[in-house]
C-alpha cells in the first residue's frame, strides 16, 4: 500500500472568452499570479489576452476539439480556478463537470457580480471567492490555500482477484467507477463510527 501526492500542483484557469476580451489587463494579472507558482494545464486565457479570441461558431470540428480539450484540462488539473462574473453556460458546465469528478473549484467573481445560482450550491469542494481590482492577487492566494486542503490524495492498495471481480461487477451494475464505490463505502463507515474524530 502506498500514497502518492503530486509535488507540482497543476491548475486549470478558465474564463469566458467574452469577458477576457473586455478586460485583458485583469485576466493577464490573474493568469500571471497563478502561473508564477503553479503549473498551468492550459494557456488558453493567456492566448486570448495576447492574440484575441478565436470565433468557433462556424467550425464544428474546432468546437469538438475545444470541448475535448476542456475536459482533458479538467481531468489533468488538481484545482480548477474560474472567473465567473458574467453569465456563461460554458462556465456553469465546466464548474459542474469539475465538481462531478471531485476537483476543488475556485469560482472567482467581482464584488458587484455575485453569482446568485452558484452561490446556492452546497458542495464542500466549491470555493466562492469575491474580489476587487485591488485585492485580486490576495484573493487568489487565499483561495488556493483553501483549495489545496481539498485535493484528493491518491491511495493505492492490493486486492484479491475475487474482490476485483466484485468491484468490476458493481461498477457495471451501478454505472459508477470502482473508486467512487469504495469512497462511498468508506464514507458510510466513517459516519457510523462514533469513535472517529476526523
Would you name each region that the model predicts?
Residues 5-36:
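A short, flexible N-terminal coil/short beta segment enriched in small residues
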Residues 34-61:
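Catalytic donor nucleotide-activated moiety binding site of glycosyltransferases and closely related
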Residues 73-92:
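Conserved beta-strand-loop-alpha-helix hinge of the TIR/SEFIR fold
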Residues 86-107:
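Amphipathic helical hotspot of TIR/SEFIR-family domains
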Residues 112-120:
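Short, glycine/polar-rich helix-capping loops at beta-to-alpha or helix-loop-helix junctions
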Residues 124-139:
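Short acidic-hydrophobic, aromatic-tinged amphipathic segments that line or gate anion-handling sites
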Residues 142-162, 168-171:
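Short Lys/Arg-rich basic patches
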Residues 174-198:
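Short, basic amphipathic alpha-helical segments that act as recognition/interaction helices
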